[in-house]
Design a protein with these regions (language model features):
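N-terminal nucleophile
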Residues: 1-238
Length: 238
């Protein structure tokens, strides 16, 4: 929920997320398909609230959550619904981009959402106002959570990402997962963190969208397990 990258080459897309949480929080379940309303959604479920930070819908829509909007905020602990459940409401809707515009987010904690389905959108909710930023899906992007990283650290992580892309001739899911699974010699602010405060990178989750199909990979770093789950739907529309 704290680092997300979006990489595209032609009609191939790789979306990858690192989930950083306090060690008191339970690990997520492995990715499974669930029917939400009329659609199938594939996601790793957070057992605490039942939501998720990363979801893929049967038509190929992907939504990924980061905690916080533009700056670190003080949580008041009195919110109407978890952000992970909000994500599921959005991705399971018939038109996620439209639903997001109309959705009432009153008493929802600030968050950033990366939403992709043919179009790419960066959405931020700061607790008071919605911010929509359309992005070019033919370009590469990276996000870091404002709740965990200062601006200078976010800029440095972006530089690491840009260097990785410049040095990588042939992009593959393995190379991207390896990049996201590297602390880059920094346990405080690398892509894999292990802070004295108890904050730790729990997992790395990735969706690959290409002409050969759609696969979600989930690396459970806490329990040293990995899962590869192909989506069974034949309705994918890239």
């Amino acid at each position: 929920m704290c680092t997300v990258s979006f990489i595209s080459q032609g009609e191939n897309y790789w979306i990858t997320s690192n989930r950083d949480e306090h060690i008191s929080r339970p690990s997520a379940h492995k990715p499974n398909e669930e029917r939400i309303g009329k659609v199938k959604v594939l996601f790793p479920k957070d057992p605490k609230a039942g939501g998720t930070w990363f979801a893929l819908k049967e038509d190929g829509a992907v939504a990924v959550l980061l905690n916080g909007a533009f700056v670190n905020h003080a949580s008041n602990g009195k919110y109407a619904k978890s952000r992970g459940l909000v994500l599921l409401d959005i991705i399971a809707s018939e038109e996620p981009f439209v639903f997001l515009q109309e959705m009432d987010l009153y008493r929802i904690e600030p968050f950033t959402l990366v939403l992709f389905h043919k179009k790419l959108l960066e959405f931020r909710w700061d607790g008071h106002q919605k911010y929509f930023k359309p992005l070019n899906p033919q370009e590469n992007h990276i996000w870091s959570s404002a709740t965990l990283y200062h601006d200078d650290v976010i800029a440095h992580r972006k530089q690491l990402f840009e260097k990785f892309m410049a040095d990588t001739n042939a992009v593959s899911f393995e190379k991207i997962l390896d990049f996201h699974s590297n602390n880059h010699n920094d346990f405080e602010n690398g892509f894999i963190i292990d802070r004295e405060t108890g904050l730790k990178t729990f997992s790395v989750t990735q969706v690959v969208l290409d002409s050969d199909g759609t696969t979600m990979r989930h690396l459970d770093l806490r329990n040293d397990r990995s899962f590869q789950v192909p989506f069974t739907s034949n309705q994918l529309t890239l």
